[in-house]
Amino acid sequence: SSLKVMVPKSTLPSYPSTEGAVIGAAVEMMKLLFPGDQEFIQQKAEEHRRASIISGANVRSDVEAGEALGRSVAQKFVARARTDRAGQAGGNPAQWSSMEDTAITKGETPWYSLELPKRPPMLPLFGKVKPFLFDSATVVALRPGPPPSVHSEQMKKETVEIYEMIANPTRERTGIVHFWADGVGTSTPSGHWDDIAAKDFLTKNYSEIRWARNFALLNMALNDAAIVCWDTKFYYFNPRPTQLNARIKTLTGIPNFPAYISGHSTFSGAAAAIL
């Protein structure tokens, strides 16, 4: 053939185009997630579409068929997302108050927002969101047992441990804290693990199929782990260490949700197991 492609030759048939399938799926999902950026999304889709054709990798009908396929698959995810209960995860003041009352009834110190001014807790009903890989009954079954009582010797020892570390910060400890802080305006803990995964995948020269599959596995695990974690947090409504000892001054901001169980640890455990 006299045609010379401008990208590496693929060993796969050209119809339907893999690039087209990616475009179709990505556009549908991005439209859901970023409704205010429709023009930008369509602009990038057109760039990707043209690149597939002008590179010599695919003819137009290859790309169009791939797009239609990707779009139809993504629409199933969009339909699921609209009914997964994430839209109700913020709850309301009566529900937040009920969680606090339950903790008090158990004789425990309830969590409260340490932000000034106080803000509503972060997605207190996210534990009710529909998981990808199991049902809501399994969320309850996976819920860990209770934390040590705030009145227990164990909790006193663990609070002292934190205070001693905070009171004697080292350069190494501070560096670790800032690397994993993942606060507002960052990729957050779950996105941090996506970044770690992406850097590793690049070194292995994975195909687009392996990239898509690996990210799907990783992020479904992160999502479902988050659901169980948030169910646990707001079931026990456990206070932050700074509530138990006012001398504890954190090296980063204090998250606006209960302490037990740790969200960072949950995300890290799920991601490390998958990777």
Predicted feature residues:
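Acidic/polar surface patches and capping/hinge elements
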Residues: 1-275
